Regions:
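Glycine-rich phosphate-binding loops of nucleotide-dependent enzymes
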Residues: 4-270
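Conserved small/polar residues in nucleotide/adenosyl-binding loops
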Residues: 271-276
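Positively charged, low-complexity/disordered segments
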Residues: 277-278, 282-288
Length: 288
């Protein structure tokens, strides 16, 4: 049952109230409408997937959430308050972090230094305060490093913490990017195709980490992903876009059986029966 206070998931977890709400969002680029009159919400503690064919407007929607784009129409609400147009770093300070479809790391820097950049939006000490109040700045530096080290341990990349990112394989680079986002201790984590280009083993690892972030940190997650096995197994609710419009919204089972979604995206022979779903700890995508 879905209420203003939250809902119970298919595996029996309690999801909280609305964290982020997009109301009647329309985004245009010249004469092209990327998003047309879309409304949906993201609730506290859930994994919310956004799916659709290429060009459906999914990444554009994440760009609206994260402040990269300002819609021509509609309203964005965060924690019940209407959000004015904000720059991305201001959105990040609100507690919203993001990874990107294409890896955006500093290749010449170590893993630790890349993860440390995720703390920049949370730092209070500027150049002047560092000069005048050195002790306070040093304490903040120690605290930030401790947070980053914990994230590195959590994602099991401590053995490569001093390795330059340029020397890492693709799958580990994606994990470092996730670590950088988590270093800001976000309330809402936006993941834009976190498993794009990964092999089966790498996808299984990333799926496990996403579930662990949601479970152990209590982080609310909005996820764009093309692998339907991953989406259906990880997500609590799914919103489906096609040509910039919303054509479906509901639980994985509801979306799987939505005829409009099947016609536009899934295909009539796909996902006619749900994959096995055990307890929360084993909500993993199949290897097939």
């Amino acid at each position: 049952m879905n209420t203003d206070d939250g809902y119970i998931t298919e595996d029996g977890r309690q999801i909280g109230g609305v964290v982020m709400e997009m109301k009647n969002i329309t985004l245009r680029f010249g004469g092209v409408t990327a998003i047309e009159d879309i409304t949906f919400d993201i609730r506290e503690g859930e994994i919310r997937a956004i799916i659709g064919p290429n060009g459906a407007g999914k990444s554009s929607m994440l760009n609206v959430v994260s402040g990269f784009y300002v819609p021509q129409e509609g309203e964005v609400f965060f924690r019940g308050e209407k959000r004015p147009p904000l720059k991305p770093f201001e959105v990040a300070r609100q507690g919203i972090a993001r990874t990107f479809q294409n890896i955006a790391l500093f290749e010449g820097m170590s893993v630790l230094d890349n993860v440390m950049t995720g703390r920049l939006t949370q730092m209070n000490s500027g150049f002047i305060s560092q000069a005048l109040w050195r002790g306070q700045a040093e304490r903040e530096e120690i605290e930030n490093r401790e947070i980053c080290e914990k994230v590195i341990d959590f994602l099991e990349i401590q053995s490569i913490r001093k390795t330059p990112v340029s020397r890492l394989p693709y799958g580990l680079k994606k994990r470092v990017e996730l670590a950088r986002a988590l270093a800001s201790e976000p309330e809402l984590l936006l993941l834009d195709e976190p498993m794009a280009g990964m092999n089966v083993e790498e996808k299984e690892d990333m799926s496990r980490f996403i579930l662990d972030v949601n479970d152990e940190f209590g982080t609310t997650i909005a996820l764009i992903e093309h692998d339907m096995g991953v989406v259906m197994d990880l997500s609590d609710r799914v919103v489906v876009m096609d040509y910039g419009k919303k054509i479906g919204d509901g639980t994985p089972n509801e979306v799987r059986n939505n005829q409009a979604v099947i016609d536009a995206y899934l295909g009539c022979l796909l996902y006619t029966s749900p994959s096995p779903r055990d307890q929360r700890g084993s909500r993993m995508p199949s290897s097939a």
